[in-house]
Amino acid sequence: MTFHEPLPSNQAAPKALLGKWSSKDAWGEPLKLVISRSGGDAYKAVATAKGKAPEEYVFTVSRHGNRWYLSAGVPKRLGGNFLIGGFDIVDGKELVVYNLDVEQVQQAVDKKELIGRSTEVPEDNGDGVLIDSPAARVLAYLDDPANSDLFVEVARFQRSGK
């Protein structure tokens, strides 16, 4: 699922987000994540899985209510636009990353709560949804307490040094 525009960055990320994190992937292999400032209001995450080349992601953050969001550009080869997710930092020692539930967002499009359309995601990644609603409307939808179950945990990292 992608969005036509990113969420506007409205404040710096919490300092606890920066640094080195570690986890295990779905196969139990080590996964390392290093997050740093990238200039302006952007941040850079470099993810390294065992036996694979590092992958770099540039993202911005915004905070609304008690929730932190991230927006990252999607590579053109995968259709472009922006990915939106959420994150929490637990006691400065644990980073939890959330994705949005695709089925619930598709239902919101079907009910006209959001404007969007189905898309084919390149490289055999199946069907996708592109949300065309302006960022203000997307935020109102994400912040609605009725949609609190919209966020699905996709990764949990432990602090692995400063």
Where are these regions (language model features)?
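Calycin-type beta-barrel ligand-binding domains and close structural analogs
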Residues: M1-L18, K24-L31, S36-K162
